[in-house]
Regions:
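Basic/polar N-terminal segments that are highly enriched at the extreme N-terminus
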Residues: 1-8, 547
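Phosphate/diphosphate-binding loops
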Residues: 260-298, 377-389, 395, 416-441
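His/Asp/Glu-enriched, well-ordered alpha-helical/loop segment
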Residues: 337-348, 355-378, 382, 397, ...
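Divalent metal-binding segments
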Residues: 6-14, 19, 23-279, 295, ...
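Extended low-complexity acidic/polar segments
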Residues: 1, 143-148, 286-289, 316-320, ...
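Structural motif corresponding to alpha-helix initiation and N-cap regions
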Residues: 44, 136-139, 389-390, 429, ...
Length: 547
């Protein structure tokens, strides 16, 4: 038995199989919590002896408890409000499998909206690949179905389509030039904009389209955090692009409505938050408390694969003239990374194409060469999804750079990515076995906005089985073990968050963040892990969710 000398515990979990993750196959039957932390682990008889008259005791009845799960890459502050407030045209959730289906949902929403008011909607990433029409709706489709309201519909984070009223409000016409790091699609015959906007071009429209109000934002965050608890997630690393979510999180915490922990990653390029302001304020990674803290800063090099805007050396398979979009030049990237690195802010750089991978590695190597610091824990978001060459892996290991791959992208839209990127570049898609063998540190992030749920159990199942939602067992030789997959969301994820002394294992002294599962994920078929029922989630020794 392991314990710390303290008064009667507040809570005891007993008669279970508690996988502590402190070492390979480490288990116990019971644990005790005082305040927010674990104070003892052992057999049920040993731990129950500590109970006092007011100790709450929960009989696990043989169920399995694991450390609370962490998702290291989400857009959570936007996710909940989007699900609650936007017109839902996502084919993963509703019956929107053709352009006509999407138009019907938009027209229904417009029928009950005042004339001239905005209709804001969201679809799914790469939905054009799955629609029967094999294309997104354009402004002409939207104009016919919704003639009296400006319409904006996003398909993932990298493409937005507007109708003529929306484009007019944003002053986008045939003469509007592409913004840096963005693209306005034009009809090759007429020169008129089609309504499809990529990357930074979306911002032109979003500046005139109404945002959520502040109360909606707060309620959406609470909604999304509670969704996380239903899948055993107790910590998320949330990418925020403006100040209101940061303020909202603080107020939610003060109001007692924050039931999962958040490490915020403010965007410092293409956002209303600047690295200069964070640096001048003196904020460093780790500022905050056990519930809300600064986890680093986020910046993006290229566009998204789901918009065919990730930047590759070779062109896209289905568009020989398209190499993707660079959103920030190397000198600006180097300058920003250097300033943040020097100020004690960990950098999390979005890079999806191989050209962007190399730019990120160049920037990190430049920063560390000028200001050596071993424990920076800088990250490359989406590194490890594909094109992890031996040279890139060596640079990652040598520089102490963390990879944050997103197997959820492959799980949901891998077939569409194969179509546009080509099998040659994806022969080693999501090469987790190879990455681990070569010493690269990888942690799991869903990249969840409102397009698919935050669900590490789904991602763990995909890592182990390699079975994708679209039916294929994809690159089975890159399977990893159940232990390795869980580490991506527990022990390694906690280390990535600079929280390895507080989270990731169930040991005395650690936070009592615990997920209780109906079955043992180590004892069932790998594909079934995604369907495991989460019976209970505790955060800081308190039950925050119960099925």
């Amino acid at each position: 038995m392991k314990s710390r000398p303290l008064p009667y515990p507040d809570l005891i979990l007993y008669n279970g199989k508690i996988r502590t993750f402190a070492s390979e196959n480490s288990t116990c039957e019971a644990l005790a919590c005082s305040g927010s932390r674990i104070v003892a682990t052992g057999t049920s008889d040993e731990v129950r002896r500590f109970a006092g008259p007011d100790t709450q005791a929960i009989d696990l009845k043989g169920r399995v408890a694991i450390p609370g799960l962490t998702d290291t890459h989400v857009h959570l502050s936007e996710k909940g409000t989007a699900e609650m407030e936007l017109v839902d045209c996502r084919d993963f959730y509703v019956d929107s499998h053709s352009v006509a289906d999407i138009l019907q949902r938009l027209a229904t929403a417009a029928s009950s909206a005042p004339k001239g008011s905005w209709i804001i909607a969201h679809g799914s990433p790469m939905q054009d690949f799955r629609l029967t029409d094999k294309r997104f709706p354009d402004k002409h489709d939207l104009d016919r179905a919704i003639p009296d309201n400006p319409v904006s519909i996003s398909f993932g984070a990298h493409i937005t389509v507007g109708n003529s009223l929306a484009l007019a409000a944003a002053k986008i016409n045939r003469d509007t030039a592409d913004p840096a790091g963005g693209h306005i699609k034009h009809d090759p015959q007429t020169g008129e904009p089609t309504g499809e906007l990529h990357e930074r071009a979306q911002l032109i429209l979003k500046k005139v389209a109404p945002e959520f109000n502040y109360l909606q934002l707060k309620d959406g965050i609470v909604f999304a955090l509670n969704q996380c608890l239903q899948r055993g997630v107790t910590t998320v690393h949330d990418i925020v692009r403006y100040a209101e979510p940061v303020r909202a999180y603080q107020e939610i915490l003060k109001e007692g409505r924050m039931h999962a922990r958040v490490s915020i990653l403010p965007r410092v390029i293409e956002s209303m938050i600047e690295s200069k302001s964070l640096i001048e304020l003196g904020l460093i990674t780790g500022f905050g408390n056990e519930w809300l803290r600064v986890g680093g800063v986020k910046m993006s090099i290229d566009g998204g694969i789901t918009g065919r805007n990730a930047c590759f050396y070779d062109p896209y398979e289905d568009d020989e003239h398209n190499h993707g979009i660079i959103r920030i030049q190397q000198d600006e990237l180097n300058h920003t990374v250097q300033k943040c690195h020097d100020a004690g802010l960990r950098c999390c750089v979005h890079a999806i194409g191989d050209r962007a991978f190399d730019m990120a590695l160049d920037a990190y190597e430049n920063a560390v060469a000028h200001s050596p610091r071993k424990d920076h824990r800088h990250r490359i978001e989406h590194m490890g999804n594909w094109l992890s060459t031996p040279e890139r892996m060596q640079r990652m290991v040598r520089g102490g750079i963390i990879a944050i791959p997103n197997i959820a992208i492959g799980y949901y839209v891998g077939d569409a990515i194969l179509d546009c990127v080509g099998e040659k570049r994806l022969t080693k898609a999501f090469p987790f076995r190879t990455l681990l063998k070569n010493g690269v540190i990888i942690a799991g992030g869903s990249d969840s906005p409102g397009y698919w749920p935050v669900d590490p159990l789904r991602d763990i199942a995909a890592c182990v089985s390699r079975k994708m939602r679209w039916g294929e067992v994809w690159v089975p030789e890159e399977r990893i073990s159940v232990s390795e997959a869980f580490a991506m969301h527990t022990t390694t994820a906690s280390w990535v968050g600079f929280e390895e002394n507080d989270k990731g294992t169930l040991e005395p002294g650690k936070l009592a963040d615990i997920a209780v599962l109906a079955e043992d994920p180590f004892a069932i078929d790998a594909e079934r892990i995604k369907d495991l029922k989460v019976e209970m989630t505790l955060v800081g020794g308190e039950v925050k969710y119960q099925a």
